[in-house]
Curated annotation (Swiss-Prot):
Protein name: Y' element ATP-dependent helicase YLL067C
One Pfam family per UniProt: DEAD
First-tier enzyme category under EC: isomerase
Gene3D superfamilies for this protein: P-loop containing nucleotide triphosphate hydrolases
Leader peptide range in chain numbering: none
Organism: Saccharomyces cerevisiae (strain ATCC 204508 / S288c)
């Protein structure tokens, strides 16, 4: 509204205004005449200006992130006519910071230079600090200026479209839009495309009087031609075709980029003069903006953060009276800027910090470490890079300065440390937080909640450093600190990046590091980059990759502590000083570790031998094993946990799980071995670590150095490779794998040290050299060697996994036994191949044949295993775990010996039939006791053949052993040809041949073939007999009874929870009928319904959440136990409100990782739960199953409490359509609106063409995150609500879209304009929002007496199908 039109309005009636203001229904939003009306405000107070007759309204800008800036320049004038229902507002041109962070005072100069060059095509422009602050507004609030440009172009398009026949109007944008008329070309797509390009020019035009770079141009203009930006802002709001024409000329000049800004401004001045000639000029409205804002600020108690030019003691009348007399009524409120104090530092601070951390006897390792600490703490060098060998103590280089900074009382320093992996994050949190010298917290806390004022050091990973949220918070640091703490004394300290070589060497992660270039490095006092493997070339490339200048070209010695000459350019443009301690000391790193390169047949087998030997020598020691793949990590952990306690980690685990496992291994002294991929080798510090074993055939030199570097105080490092399989394959973009040969020489080459190949001192801790090793390490090597010799003498070879293990996949070996309806992993629990060896599983194809009779001089040992030498063979079942088959009775020189489970040197045998654990197979005689069988018919002369169980003539001997243990049968003497000799009791003279399991033509006896159960194998799973059983190190057979318990448990669960149909669900288990299940069915409930950590453990069987060897899933299982468990959890949710369900989740915490145990717990209350559901949901089943109609007239409370209950069906529909029409026009976010009636804008939601774009729009504005934080949605998984828009509610969606078609058809048949009803995603957003709107739900359940509470979203959505009879008996949807 123009000021000249004020005469149309009468003087406002104060009482009338107050009444209208209190009645919010009468408040109608009216856009201002400027383009800045989008600032969300609310009326806080008002007063009447008796002199001007205006009512002054103080408004609060609700969308501002900075509450102290919320009251600046936002006092608006309101004039109300006697019969006028709109309040006409004039909103000041304060930018809306709702869409972006608060402007920073430290913008990266590179961005500003790029912007200026793009606009003006010049490279040399001088800026002052005020220019930086002004230009930073554009980058931090670019979305605002984009929207401003869009609105300007849309306004032009609307006006021009209204006059399509006006040729002058259609030609206004001819040059601007590729020579095409505006009506055809300036559509939505082109508006947005050109709007983005126009935004920076628009910004400069609006702020031209605030930039010193254009002061020369302004000074060159005559006084009457100076640019009036206030006039220009109003000129940029065309309302008539003639104004569009002038505005298009400005756009044309700016978009063509042919003229400098001066020429563009001259065009704007020319347009303004033409505009004034047309009589469209208007004086600026003078208000009490500054004075009233100052009064409001005083009332809030914020005057200490502002200073004003007038006294704060004047009352409201003085303020109003002084307005006319004051010529400086437009005075702005400026912020008080206080210079941050800086407490002096001294070298003694570092010494005191060391004594706090390590005690009074603290001393530096060497002079280099001392000088580096002083360089970091005292010097003005803005950026420092340090390369020191692993184990040198790089952490203390920044740890001690951080403790010294924390001791400063006048200034609070907040620093940040970033590491490459989550595993290292957990270790750093433990190390840096010890002794209580620093308050340490995860950087995620800072990103989500901001600075808490207590934490000294935030620790995060590289992904956090690259995140947009982190860079935005750093950019807004000054404003955040002043607003939060009302002081300038909270200061950004150090930015520390550990193992920064990964920026260059981690090729596969470089795309994740792109966001680091947006970080404002200049905001930090100092940047520190540390690594043990970053030579100058790697370090320089890594720093440039994150947007820094790189290393200083001149190499700096550590003794050169020169102060920087010019720091005005900022940290990001200043070269980084490199301190290379490895070159300074000229010592090859890792000489204190004994490095051994071995080629072996089986890497896991050799590694197991080494680990068992180490723990026998040093029972309290720890070890790290580095595998090449995640599958191999899980396989090793599964195989070795029976020998010692194991922790395994790889990249597929979640961040929280990695942190938890790392902390457990570091702090728990009973944990012995950490198995993982290379992520466990960087930076982690573990006490009692004595051995590192590497099984990766493709390690590069950096990975090798980092792995060996974990051995801080010496130890053993083994590089195990398989024979004839070493392949030095170079992975694309990465360093090549290490080569065969001297490891020390390759380390020297990597660090650029002098080669000593062929000279004295070439081998340092490698190739058998022990001269540089500590006494403890040498003693450990000698003890390991002695133990190896002792084991070789005793023939105590450990049979572990075959070499084919390296190529096997864990999903093929372990996980295929785990049933899961999600993963279709069929559970196989059957017997071994039909014809196997007695119990030994010798290496044959489909059937196992025992070894032929070995002829010795005086004695013969019957053997079943093949793989024998020329003289001896191992006995029947050598070193089995759970099953043993006794050998047949061998008659040699008048004495018969039966060998069973012989693990000795030559011919030691035990009693004939030893009945071992649950699955031992009896042998020779069936007519003896359960454990011993003798030789039959031994009383002969010299050549008697004693046959056992003879049921044939002289040519055939039948089976000796009967069926044992229901699974194993041994056939000792099967039918042969014409001259079969009983192989059990063979009679020889001096040299006897006892044949047990041989299959020949003339003189053969059948092998003792057994049908071995799955228990015969070491893991309880018979998989083609590829695994040899593993013998315990103490010569005792590893007797495993767990597999029988698993089998028994599996059978019990199968009987208790039978599910042979894919449609099986927990409601059927509870006993509900099929028609009841149809409506109570828990659709939309999946694993995401469960809160985080409940039934969601990784690395276990997905069907039962147990370790793979303890899996209780069974073959043919259609529905997994985990699915039944989360459905059972949903049933419990049906019966509990939010508070009760939260308590229930705490009560079942012991079952969060055990869905099978939870099902057992749930089944105990089976009958009680069934009765509760029948009682609580009787009304729901009556409505949904029997389709009973709800009549609003039956609700007494509804008729009395709500006008809607008295409306007709037509009125209800019109009200419904009107609400949706308003939401569509205002582009309001639907879910947020129906959640708490908050009218937030989300244009993308209404423009989305598919569900994916729709969900992305909601996620972008943070709807799902707010929903979880504000409502009971936080009791479900983070993806639960989002997935409601994708794969769930298909049936309801089909019905809804069908009803839309029917509605459109009916409207067209009646000849009326169809009412626009919402599409499915908007409709579902409404249902979800109302479900979590607790206030609405309570009110609805109170007014509509026929319904009660429902606590599951599927049931609430299903109620949308119910129809309600309105007051006029018209059916409307519920």
């Amino acid at each position: 509204m123009k000021v000249s039109d004020r005469r149309k309005f009468e003087k406002a009636n104060f009482d009338e205004f107050e009444s209208a203001l209190n009645n919010k229904n009468d408040l109608v939003h009216c856009p201002s005449i400027t383009l800045f009306e989008s600032i969300p405000t609310e009326v806080r107070s008002f007063y009447e200006d008796e002199k001007s007759g205006l009512i002054k309204v103080v408004k609060f800008r609700t969308g501002a992130m900075d509450r102290k800036r919320s009251f600046e320049k936002i006092v608006v004038s309101v004039m109300v006519g006697k019969n006028v229902q709109k309040f006409l507002t004039f909103v000041e041109d304060e930018p809306d910071f709702q869409g972006g962070p608060i402007p920073s005072k430290y913008l990266i100069p590179k961005k500003i230079n790029l912007m200026v060059y793009t606009l003006f095509q010049v490279h040399t422009l001088k800026f002052n600090r005020k220019d930086y602050d002004t230009l930073s507004l554009f980058y931090l609030n670019r979305g605002y200026y984009n929207e401003l440009s869009f609105r300007v172009l849309e306004r032009c398009h609307e006006i021009a479209s209204a006059r399509p026949n006006d040729s002058s109007t259609m030609r206004t944008f001819t040059d601007f839009v590729s020579g095409a008329p505006i009506v055809r070309s300036l559509q939505k797509s082109t508006i947005r495309r050109y709007g983005y390009n126009l935004a920076p020019h628009m910004f400069l035009l609006l702020h031209v009087d605030e930039l010193s770079i254009f002061s020369a141009y302004q000074a060159s203009l005559p006084g009457e031609k100076k640019v009036d930006t206030e006039r220009l802002k109003r000129d940029l709001c065309p309302r008539k075709p003639i104004e569009i024409k002038y505005f298009s000329q400005i756009c044309n000049d700016m978009m063509n980029k042919k003229d400098r800004l001066g020429d563009v401004l001259a065009t704007a001045q020319r347009i303004r003069r033409r505009y004034n000639k047309n009589g469209s000029s208007e004086p600026r409205l003078k208000t009490l903006d500054g004075l009233t804002s100052e009064r409001w600020i005083q009332w809030l108690g914020l005057e200490s953060d502002y200073h004003c030019s007038f006294s704060s003691t004047r009352n409201a009348e003085d303020v109003v009276a002084g307005e006319a007399a004051s010529s400086d009524h437009d005075q702005k409120i400026s912020r008080v800027t206080r210079k941050r104090p800086r407490e002096p530092k001294s070298t003694n601070d570092i010494l005191v910090a060391g004594q706090k951390l390590f005690g009074s006897s603290f001393e530096f390792r060497d002079l280099h470490q001392l000088r580096l600490c002083h360089e970091i703490y005292m010097a003005d060098t803005p950026s420092v890079a340090v390369q020191a060998p692993p184990g040198y103590g790089k952490t203390e280089l920044f740890h001690l300065p951080l403790i010294a900074l924390a001791s400063k009382g006048d200034v609070k320093y907040v620093s940040f440390l970033f590491v490459p992996y989550t595993v290292l994050l957990a270790n750093c949190m433990i190390r840096l937080g010890r002794c209580g010298c620093l308050n340490v917290a995860p950087v995620r806390n800072f990103i989500e909640e901001g600075c808490d004022g207590v934490t000294d050091l935030y620790v995060g990973i590289y992904d956090d450093l690259a995140s947009t949220n982190f860079t935005d918070r750093i950019a807004a640091w000054e404003n955040i600190v002043e607003c939060t703490f009302r002081t300038n004394n909270v200061k950004l300290g150090y930015l520390i990046v550990d193992e920064f070589h990964n920026f260059e060497t981690e090729v596969y992660r470089q795309s994740q590091f792109g966001g680091i270039t947006n970080l404002d490095f200049d905001a930090f006092e100092k940047a520190i980059f540390l690594s043990g493997t970053a030579p100058e070339a790697v370090a320089d490339a890594a720093l440039q990759r994150i947007g820094l200048t790189g290393l200083a070209k001149k190499s700096m010695d550590i003794n050169e502590l020169k102060r920087s000459e010019d720091l005005s350019r900022g940290l990001s443009s200043y070269p980084t000083r490199m301190f290379n301690l490895i070159k300074e000391k000229s010592e090859v790193p890792l000489g204190h570790v004994h490095k051994i390169w071995k080629k072996v047949e089986s890497q896991p087998e050799e590694a197991l031998k080494l680990l068992l030997a180490l723990f026998e020598i040093e029972p309290e020691s720890k070890a790290i094993v580095v595998a090449s793949t995640t599958n191999e990590v899980e396989e090793l952990a599964c195989s070795w946990r029976k020998y010692f306690r194991v922790v395994w980690i790889h990249g597929k685990l979640g961040a929280a799980e990695k942190v938890s496992r790392t902390k457990e291994f570091v702090t728990d002294g009973s944990m012995r071995v950490l198995i993982g991929t290379k992520l466990v080798t960087e930076g982690i510090d573990i006490k009692q670590l004595m051995m590192v074993i590497m099984l990766d055939n493709r390690l590069n030199i950096i990975e090798l150095i980092q792995g060996v570097g974990r051995l801080r105080d010496g130890g053993l490092c083994y590089l195990l490779s398989r024979k004839n399989s070493w392949a030095a394959r170079n992975r694309k973009g990465e360093l090549p794998p290490i080569k065969e040969g001297c490891i020390t020489e390759q380390v020297r080459e990597f660090y650029g040290l002098e080669s000593k190949k062929g000279k004295k001192g070439q081998h340092v801790g490698c190739c058998g050299s022990r001269t540089d090793l500590s006494a403890d390490t040498v003693e450990l090597i000698e003890r390991m060697d002695r133990l190896a010799e002792k084991q070789a003498t005793a023939s105590m070879s450990i049979v572990a996994l075959p070499s084919s293990f390296q190529e096997s996949n864990s999903s093929d070996r372990c996980r295929k036994y785990c049933s899961s309806d999600e993963d279709s992993n069929t559970c196989i629990h059957g017997s071994a191949n039909a014809s196997t060896n007695a119990t030994t599983n010798s290496s044959t194809n489909a059937t196992t044949t025992a070894s032929t009779n070995v002829r010795t001089s005086a004695t013969t040992t019957a053997s079943i295993n093949v793989r024998t030498s020329a003289t001896t063979t191992e006995s029947t079942n050598s070193s089995t775990n759970a099953t043993t088959t006794a050998s047949t009775n061998v008659r040699t020189s008048a004495t018969t010996t039966a060998s069973i489970n012989v693990r000795t040197s030559a011919t030691t045998t035990e009693s004939t039939n030893s009945n071992t654990s649950a699955t031992t197979t009896e042998s020779t005689d069936s007519n003896t006791s359960a454990t011993t069988t003798e030789s039959t018919d031994s009383s002969t002369n010299a050549t008697t053949t004693a046959s056992i169980n003879v049921r044939t003539s002289a040519t055939t001997t039948e089976s000796t052993n009967s069926n044992t243990n229901a699974t194993t049968t041994e056939s000792t003497n099967s039918s042969t040809n014409a001259t079969t000799t009983e192989g059990t009791n063979s009679n020889t003279s001096a040299t006897t041949t006892a044949s047990t399991n041989s299959s020949t033509n003339a003189t053969t006896t059948e092998s003792t073939n057994a049908s071995a159960k799955e228990d015969a194998n070491k893991d309880g799973n018979a998989e083609d007999n590829r695994f040899h059983p593993v013998t315990d190190i103490n010569k005792e057979s590893y007797k495993r009874k767990g597999s029988q318990m698993v089998l028994l448990e599996r059978k019990k669960l199968k009987a208790q929870f039978p599910n042979t149909s894919e449609n099986m669900n927990v409601l059927q288990f509870l006993g509900f009928r099929s028609d009841e299940i149809k409506h109570l069915f828990l659709y939309g409930i999946d694993v995401y319904f469960c809160p985080e950590g409940v039934f969601t453990q990784y690395g276990l069987c997905k069907g039962c959440q147990k370790m793979f060897e303890l899996c209780v899933c069974w073959a043919g299982q259609k529905v997994s136990y985990r699915r039944m468990a989360w459905e059972a959890l949903a049933v419990e949710r049906m019966l509990r409100n939010d508070e009760e369900y939260k308590e229930y989740l705490e009560d079942i915490e012991p079952y969060h990782g055990d869905p099978v145990g939870y099902l057992k717990f749930f089944s105990v209350k089976r009958g009680e739960i069934y009765s509760q559901i029948q009682r609580n949901y009787a009304w729901y089943l009556a409505i949904t199953r029997r389709r009973e109609t709800i009549s609003v007239l039956d609700s007494t409370r509804g008729k009395q409490g709500s006008q809607v209950f008295r409306m007709s069906g037509r009125q209800i529909k019109e009200l419904y359509y009107k609400v949706w029409s308003n939401l569509r026009e205002s582009k309001t976010e639907v879910l947020q609106y129906f959640l708490n009636w908050d009218e937030k804008k989300c244009r993308e939601e209404w423009e989305a063409k598919d569900d994916t774009v729709f969900v992305e729009a909601l996620e972008k504005v943070g709807v799902f995150q707010r929903l979880r934080s504000m409502t009971s949605a936080g009791l479900q998984g983070p993806q639960y609500v989002k997935l409601q828009f994708s794969r769930h509610h298909r049936q309801l969606r089909s019905r809804y879209e069908l009803s839309l078609g029917m509605h459109l058809r009916d409207q067209l048949a009646l000849g009326v304009t169809p009412s626009k009803v919402p599409h499915w995603t908007a409709f579902l957003s409404m249902l979800i929002g109302l479900f979590y709107n607790k206030t609405f739900r309570q009110k609805l359940e109170y007014l509509l007496e026929q319904i009660s509470e429902v606590w599951l979203l599927p049931h609430w959505v299903d109620l949308a199908n119910v129809e309600v009879l309105a007051a006029d008996n018209t059916r409307v949807p519920c």
